[in-house]
Amino acid sequence: SAGSAAKPVLEVSISGRSTSTEIDTATWQVERIVGTRGNPQPFYGLIGDIPELSVLEQNFHGLHLTQATSLFETITWAVLGQQISANVAASLRRKITENYGRVGETDGQAYALFPRPEDLVHANIEDLRSLGLSQRKAEYTLGLRDEFGSGQITESRFEAMDDAEVETELLKLRGIGPWTAHWL
């Protein structure tokens, strides 16, 4: 990035030939990943009057929360990480990525990509259980695959909703309770 914390500028470079749609998609994803699509001002307003927290704004002004590359990854990661340690959750995520994800390459460097719903089309409960998922987490993961794969859940649909509507929709999904819906 360029600019300053007060006036940040995000620079994105894409190698190779790309269509304008691909460039727009890549830019949107980078903005999502590095968190620049959100406005931190409401957060600053909440913590500004609390001395113990206002130091966060002073020390980390301009910092944005990073996000996963897709809503599917975000929600799946939230479900996988429930009621287990961060290390175990990261291990499950890694195993799912290694077994079902794709490999992207940039400048000769390979990157493991979290699977898309269609990458999990042949996965079944036993397959996911063999990776260490519990019965329920395997069921929930496949349920999310089906919801996203069928188009019932889309990022554009969620982006058009306010927070309360998103939370209501999330609570309809198996594996997501009030705490997870609010966290997401």
What are these regions (language model features)?
Residues 1-184:
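HhH-family (HhH-GPD) DNA N-glycosylase catalytic core used in base-excision repair
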